[in-house]
Amino acid sequence: MTSHLPYRIDLAGTWIDQPYVSRYGAGWALTVSIEPTIEFMERGGMSTSTRNAAKKIWPYELPNYNEEMMARLLFCFENDPERDGHISGAQDAIGICMSGLNRHFYDNHFWPERIESYHDEETLSWLESHLCLVEMFPRRKGCSVVAGMDITPEKVRALTSAADRCWQAIMERDLNGFAAAFSDSFNAQIAMFPAMMAEGVEEHISRWKPQSLAHKMSGAGGGGYLVLVIDGPVPEGAIPVKIRRKDSF
């Protein structure tokens, strides 16, 4: 039986869910929960490791239950600092379990101080009509996206400012503002984590740049999927996005 568990797309503020980033400045991460219209590849920035952990609790679909509670449960289930020493960012569990558009505020802790959910149908329809995904390649074994990281207060401010502007542009359905903030958020990410731009990524970006207003890599980068902001039909070869609505069980 096929699993109907959602995936997530991180729109802006990626990496702020790690305390070693938010210690330099608090801010929001923005995610949307998306329907599993295809089975996305592993090591592709689509939170498949967190989704695989979720399958151990809910093999086929999420229960009709408090979404934030499920996200907290999944986050705690996946992460064992005594054993692993590495904590997956909370944005993955939140992005999978919490429907619609969400932003979560991080301030030097693994779990956000607060979460805001948005379910306006016209806005979600607008947002998904301007997003699509394109496949690149799985993040290669041995690839460390944190190698050479350079985190400074100024770079974190650039990230958090972009996330603030991205949210506001979505609320106003301002496509150009959304694309600009989306791009600024990605640029802030790679300024702190240059190893996200693994060999071969730039070629894919160059290929799709003429067909998009903005782009970013999903998740931690190093490969995976490009998320494109578009103005018009989904380009041939790209994957449409379907945002999961509340109570769509």
Spans of features found by a protein language model:
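C-terminal nucleotide
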Residues: M1-A12, I16-R23, G27-N52, W58-I87, ...
